[in-house]
């Protein structure tokens, strides 16, 4: 009778350990998915240290040049202030750009869609940053 209780107790402990292991694995998987959420298609994420990124600089200059052609404007590229990316069919870049309009510095927001494997780049939007908005 006593052996039966010990065997039952050991079996119960093994079941509890197995359940704890499964629960821990699921929790770790959920955390891993949450950690990678910014990498999923559709999520917009900040790009750090973008002032020195040559690709982003080139995209910002492209945005200003495209706007100048479409709007018959003469804005001069000054610097890239901020950048974000979103994975779509390619990459959508959300750029905050400082330009010079004559002698006045202004901030603009640009959206540039790029699909490098197709040699495709398109300015989707170019608009002034609203007064009081943070860059």
Curated annotation (Swiss-Prot):
Transmembrane segments: none
Keyword Signal among UniProt keywords: yes
Signal peptide positions on this chain: 1-24
Site (Reactive site): 42
Motif Secondary area of contact positions after renumbering to this chain: 86-90
Keyword Signal: yes
Record's keyword terms, sorted: Protease inhibitor, Signal, Thiol protease inhibitor
Family stated for the protein in its record: Belongs to the cystatin family. Phytocystatin subfamily.
Name listed for the protein in its UniProt record: Cystatin-1
Organism, scientific name: Zea mays (Maize)
